Amino acid sequence: MGSTSSLYAAIDLGSNSFHMLVVREVAGSIQTLTRIKRKVRLAAGLNSENALSNEAMERGWQCLRLFAERLQDIPPSQIRVVATATLRLAVNAGDFIAKAQEILGCPVQVISGEEEARLIYQGVAHTTGGADQRLVVDIGGASTELVTGTGAQTTSLFSLSMGCVTWLERYFADRNLGQENFDAAEKAAREVLRPIADELRYHGWKVCVGASGTVQALQEIMMAQGMDERITLEKLQQLKQRAIHCGRLEELEIDGLTLERALVFPSGLAILIAIFTELNIQYMTLAGGALREGLVYGMLHLAVEQDIRSRTLRNIQRRFMIDIDQAQRVAKVAANFFDQVENEWHLEAISRDLLISACQLHEIGLSVDFKQAPQHAAYLVRNLDLPGFTPAQKKLLATLLLNQTNPVDLSSLHQQNAVPPRVAEQLCRLLRLAIIFASRRRDDLVPEMTLQANHELLTLTLPQGWLTQHPLGKEIIAQESQWQSYVHWPLEVH
């Protein structure tokens, strides 16, 4: 029993898909062991009287038989099963739930829309970095949740009766992706949103986060097409035109859109366009977690950390036995350099955060081997679960670590899409210099330096006589100047 007592499971009986998440608690964080998702499309089985068809119920039970096998090893007190919009609506939900409980061997709780919204917000708060004041949007199969909050506290909660399955059946039933179907779907969604828009705007938000399959699909499309990961209304309109151009649902082909997600993509897209338009959202990013993560963190009674990225970095430093003092030393030098050039280079605060994060992890590759340590570091960061960092930010961190020393691979810095290529180059230069000047691993041996930027030219001024007194340091800096010059990064050292 010992090895299973730290296991927790969360099951979400959604209107479109059933999901199961099994995690292990590790040092105040969660490690994902199993994720199973099955498209059950329960909402599609509701008739005009809101009765679930036998076929839809059977699809659901069949899926739960798969889940049940995995649950046998987990203490019942560490399992939570919740049902959402379709089972709130269905007049015969009791029949479905009775058999579901028999199959799973644990209670199934039908939660209210507000409770669902609260749990979604908790999942986002525990797993997603960025500004504290946020608007969270989750487009489900039969309901859409919108929540505002600050830190761990929600300020407004709404659950609306519209979702990608119900909108598919209502506005795209003929499988025609014409402008008129999109117009009707968007108009209806805006009418549902209008009564709550004022209250959401009143509470306000600094960042908007999407936590659903529709937003996940958009992220996958944008990554596949090499766009940056911010979802904007302009990009949504472009994708709508692409869908209209395809003509019919069965012919919908967009780079990066999986077959599994394609069916409910147009209806989800129409709802999202309505949300962007009605609430005047500038951009949206993808959440790190939602309902299932909210359930798991709720069972663990873990406090929401103010800075999720810091928690992630601390956990990884411990796990890979990174020298934390040295990581801090490099970060301090890099921050000092950044602060001296940020105005000339027009750098944003998020770039500083990402540079410091790269410093905190720059020696992770040594846990594999000194030889090829930068390549090992890049591989680890690309493949580790990093709550608080978006997929594009992970890719940038990996790319910076790959280029922390040795000749620069410029193309890799241009292939990430978290920041513009020029910014990635600038962060890389600062990281490399910080690593060099902190390499003696003692605070008192880091020289006082000034760094000036004039367009792309960096001028580094060292204390009088420093280069003469440090022949190895002088050689390393000369080599670095040469490597930077190969990629047209002029560096002068005095």
Curated annotation (Swiss-Prot):
SUPFAM superfamilies xrefs: Actin-like ATPase domain, HD-domain/PDEase-like
Superkingdom of this protein's organism: Bacteria
Pathway this chain belongs to: Purine metabolism; ppGpp biosynthesis; ppGpp from GTP: step 2/2
Cited CDD domains: ASKHA_NBD_EcGppA-like
Protein name as catalogued: Guanosine-5'-triphosphate,3'-diphosphate pyrophosphatase
HAMAP family: GppA (MF_01550)
Top EC group: hydrolase
PANTHER family reported for this sequence: EXOPOLYPHOSPHATASE, RETROGRADE REGULATION PROTEIN 2
Catalytic activity, EC: 3.6.1.40
NCBIfam families according to UniProt: PRK11031.1 (NF008260)
Gene3D superfamilies (alphabetical): 3.30.420.40, Exopolyphosphatase. Domain 2 (3.30.420.150), Hypothetical protein af1432 (1.10.3210.10)
Biological role: Catalyzes the conversion of pppGpp to ppGpp. Guanosine pentaphosphate (pppGpp) is a cytoplasmic signaling molecule which together with ppGpp controls the 'stringent response', an adaptive process that allows bacteria to respond to amino acid starvation, resulting in the coordinated regulation of numerous cellular activities.
GO molecular function ontology, one term from the record: guanosine-5'-triphosphate,3'-diphosphate diphosphatase activity
Reactions performed catalytically: guanosine 3'-diphosphate 5'-triphosphate + H2O = guanosine 3',5'-bis(diphosphate) + phosphate + H(+)
Keywords linked to the UniProt accession: Hydrolase
Stated family: Belongs to the GppA/Ppx family. GppA subfamily.
GO biological process, one term: guanosine tetraphosphate biosynthetic process
